[in-house]
Regions:
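Extended substrate/RNA-proximal surfaces in nucleic-acid metabolism proteins
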Residues: 1-76
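Charged catalytic cores and adjacent phosphate/nucleic-acid-binding surfaces used
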Residues: 50-51, 55-59, 66-131
């Protein structure tokens, strides 16, 4: 997959900008003001993603559900046996968030995971591997 940070890293390595997350990044991809190449992404529905992943034999782990206020959906998917795990360990989870996610894993026999906050070195707020 090609992400904005990958594009910017290549431009930075070529000497075409002085930082991965600098003025050029804001000009191209910024939210306020809107970047010149940023467009509204059309995401598939949750049901479509689940069906595609399951058809491919994937293990479905819901990453950082508390960050995006997705706990009602996580509770539903866990109860229905649709997901296989929940990311419990995440830098932005409060102790209460961790406790609720861990309890759901225990209740429904789900995998207890962590580590999706590591996005490599090209991130505004880098987190070490495993966070």
């Amino acid at each position: 997959m090609l992400f904005k940070s990958g594009i910017m890293e290549a431009l930075h390595q070529l000497g075409l900008c002085d930082a991965v997350y600098g003025k050029l990044y804001s000009y191209l991809f910024g939210w306020e003001p809107r970047g010149v190449v940023l467009h509204q992404v059309k995401y598939p529905s949750v049901q479509e993603v689940i069906a595609t992943a399951k058809a491919a034999g994937a293990v479905l782990v819901f990453a950082h559900p508390t960050v995006y206020k997705s706990m009602p959906l996580v509770r539903q998917l866990a109860k229905e046996g649709i997901i296989d795990g929940i990311e419990v360990e995440h830098p932005r989870n409060s102790p209460e968030d961790r406790a609720e996610c861990a309890a759901l894993c225990e209740q429904y026999g789900l995998i207890h995971t962590g580590g999706t906050a590591f996005h490599g070195p090209n991130h505004k707020v880098p987190h070490p591997v495993g966070t």
